[in-house]
Design a protein with these regions (language model features):
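Aromatic- and glycine-rich beta-strand/loop motifs that create alpha-glucan
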Residues: 1-22
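Alpha-helical transmembrane segments of multi-pass membrane transporters/translocases
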Residues: 2, 23, 212-248
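Membrane-helix interface segments
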Residues: 16-19, 89-95, 170-174
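Hydrophobic alpha-helical membrane-insertion segments
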Residues: 22-27, 99-117, 175-192
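Secretory targeting signals
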Residues: 29-69, 95-166, 208-228
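Transmembrane helix segments
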Residues: 31-39, 165-203
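Hydrophobic/aromatic residues in alpha-helical transmembrane segments
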Residues: 63-67, 76, 80, 115, ...
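Transmembrane helix boundary and interhelical loop/hinge segments in multi-pass membrane proteins
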Residues: 67-86, 90, 248
Length: 248
C-alpha cells in the first residue's frame, strides 16, 4: 500500500499543473485581497478573509480535475494492467488512489489557509483575526470552519467524481444532476425527507459562510456534516466495489 501511495504521489508531482496551478491560485487570491482594499464596501476585509479570498474554490476546481483523471488515465494509457501484473489487488490500488487524493487535498487546503493569513496581514494589518465578541467566532475560527465545511463538501463532489470515473458516462451524470438540482429545489418545500439528498448536502459550503442558508437547505450545519460524511463513505465504498468488478 505504501509503495502504491508513493507512486501515485510521484505521478501527481510529476505533472506541471500540480505546482503551477497552486501558484496561479495564490496570485489570484492576492489579486482579490488587493481589490478588497480598493472596493472595501463591496468586498469587506472580514468577508474576504473568511472566504479565503476564494482560494478554496480554485483549489476545489483543481481537485475535481485530478479526481476525474486519477482512474481514467490508468485505463487510457494501459498502466492499470502493469499494476495488476505486479500482483497488487484491485482494492489496494483504488484505496491508494483515494488516500493520495486525500493527502493532496489536505495539502491544498492547508496552503490556502496559510496564504489567507499572510494575505490578510499584508493588506489588512489592522484586522484582528483572533478577536471574538459574544457568540461571534473570531475571524480565524470562521476561516477554519469555512475550510472544514468546504473540505467536506468538496470531498462529497470528489467521491461522486471517482464513482463516475469508475462506472458511468460523465455527460449523463452531470445532466442528471442538473435536472435533480432543479427538481429538489422545487420539491424541498413539499417533501421533507428530500432535504437529505446528496445535492442538498453540497450546500454545506454555502451554509458555513451564511448561517441563514439553513432556511433553504432545511438542515442545521451539524446535520449537513453528518449527511456529507455518510454519503462520502457510501460513494467511496461503491467506488471500491465497482473498481473490483470493472473489466480491464
Amino acid at each position: 500500500m505504501g509503495t502504491l501511495i508513493k507512486q501515485e504521489c510521484f505521478k501527481l508531482f510529476k505533472k506541471k499543473s500540480t505546482f503551477i496551478a497552486p501558484i496561479v491560485f495564490i496570485l489570484l487570491m492576492v489579486a482579490q485581497g488587493y481589490i478588497a482594499t480598493k472596493y472595501n464596501k463591496i468586498f469587506t476585509p472580514q468577508e474576504s478573509f473568511t472566504s479565503a479570498y476564494n482560494g478554496f474554490s480554485w483549489f476545489a476546481f483543481l481537485l475535481i480535475i485530478q479526481a476525474s483523471t486519477i482512474i481514467s488515465m490508468e485505463f487510457h494509457y494501459g498502466t492499470i494492467k502493469n499494476l495488476l501484473y505486479r500482483e497488487y489487488s484491485r482494492t489496494t490500488m483504488i484505496v491508494s488512489k483515494i488516500i493520495t487524493l486525500f493527502i493532496i487535498s489536505l495539502i491544498y487546503f492547508v496552503i490556502t489557509i496559510i496564504a489567507s493569513i499572510v494575505i490578510g496581514s499584508l493588506f489588512f494589518n489592522d484586522l484582528n483575526i483572533f478577536e471574538s465578541s459574544g457568540n461571534q467566532l473570531s475571524l480565524l475560527n470562521q476561516l477554519l470552519l469555512v475550510s472544514l465545511g468546504t473540505f467536506v463538501g468538496v470531498w462529497l463532489v470528489l467521491s461522486l467524481t471517482l464513482l463516475l470515473s469508475s462506472a458511468t458516462n460523465s455527460t449523463v451524470f452531470y445532466l442528471a444532476s442538473s435536472i435533480l438540482a432543479v427538481i429538489q429545489t422545487a420539491l424541498l418545500e413539499k417533501i421533507d425527507w428530500l432535504k437529505w439528498n446528496p445535492i442538498n448536502m453540497m450546500n454545506i459550503m454555502l451554509q458555513t459562510v451564511e448561517k441563514g442558508f439553513s432556511k433553504s437547505t432545511k438542515l442545521e450545519l451539524h446535520e449537513l456534516f453528518i449527511g456529507n460524511i455518510a454519503y462520502i463513505s457510501i460513494f467511496l465504498i461503491l467506488v471500491v466495489f465497482i473498481f473490483k468488478k470493472k473489466n480491464i
